[in-house]
Amino acid sequence: MVFFDLGDTLWHFPAMPPVEVVRGETMKRVSALVRSWGYEVDGERAYLARDIRFAIEEETSRAFHGDCIDPGYPDICRRVAARHGLDLTPEQGMALWEAWNLGGAFLGRRLYPDVLDTLRWLRGRGYRLGAITNRGYSGPRFHEEMRDLGLAELFEVTVISCDVGYMKPHPRIFQYALEAMDVEAAESVMVGDSLRADVEGAKTVGMLAVWRRPSAADPVEATEDQPEQAGPVQPDYVIGTIGELRSLPLFIASGPAG
């Protein structure tokens, strides 16, 4: 069984719009939603999208470097909205969170060139595939994008932190994935770009770990992990691209372990 991280492992954002365009679009969508609920959007309330971003960045960092419990992003949106005088229901909090997420299509998400061929090669050798990802949004638009990218048909399971309540490297998210696929950790491999989230997390539960080493062209999600590269947990294998999996003895010497 081979599990993959998603961001900066299988896909990246080479065509991301300028930051001012992204933030402007977020503000537009959030403001339109708030107006649809009958609220005025003026004064400080016009900066609701910005304040949600600040809170998300703070809470995500706290969780990732702390207890790895998912922060509950719709609730974060409700709390920030309350500071702007908006009394939102849980359903409205979820709608606000969905509006704040622009989606991979808008942000220019693309698979790395060798991803689909490599995943199909692994499937052809009898390996079962899945994904384990730290992600605050798992709504219908995300799963539609997974289908559009060609990943949904290749993965038997996609385990998302906001759905299970735990972020990598917490053992529970890995255990959830193993239980969902009815496989043992010793039979499984984790491939990802984060030494802490993917390598440390996988090895803690007894999985093999392949580190997809971030390149200079992929700085977005790698920056956070740079201090961890000298840590005590080391990957079993290191690759520069997903295509290099096809040359690892792990995958060419034999078929799946179980």
What residues fall within each predicted segment?
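Conserved phosphoryl-transfer catalytic core
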Residues: 7, 13-63
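Short, flexible/disordered intra-domain loops and linkers
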Residues: 14-24, 65-69, 139, 219-222
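Helix-loop "lid/cap" segments that line or gate small-molecule binding pockets
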Residues: 25-40, 71-87, 150
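Short, surface-exposed acidic
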Residues: 34-51, 83-96, 153-155
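Short, Lys/Arg-enriched alpha-helical recognition elements, typified by the DNA-recognition helix
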Residues: 50-56, 76-78, 96-103
